[in-house]
Amino acid sequence: MQQLIEEITKEQLRTDLPAFRPGDTLRVHVKVVEGTRERIQIFEGVVIKRRGGGISETFTVRKISYGVGVERTFPVHTPKIANIEVVRHGKVRRAKLYYLRELRGKAARIKEIRR
């Protein structure tokens, strides 16, 4: 039974996404349905966590919008994500960057590394 589940989920996994880690700044292109129309909405921010594995893997992106912190969690393998762009790679020493929630302004910056 477990093999059957693994085979089915393996077909659903996306392979067109770039490699990214917590601390990286992403530009996520999300498909949004409004009535009968479908459009692309861009959500750009810092990856503060990545959890799970396989089909249930998710990541959370945080950005500041008009002075208010906004976090959005996306499943990695969802068809609602049209594209993911890695804007910059950040140098961090933690897997979960929850401490960024308390930091404001320049203190919340993440050092960039060249890859």
Curated annotation (Swiss-Prot):
This is Large ribosomal subunit protein bL19. Pfam families: Ribosomal_L19. It comes from Bacillus pumilus (strain SAFR-032). The gene is rplS. Belongs to the bacterial ribosomal protein bL19 family. Keywords: Ribonucleoprotein, Ribosomal protein. One of its GO terms (biological process) is translation. This protein is located at the 30S-50S ribosomal subunit interface and may play a role in the structure and function of the aminoacyl-tRNA binding site. GO terms for molecular function: structural constituent of ribosome.
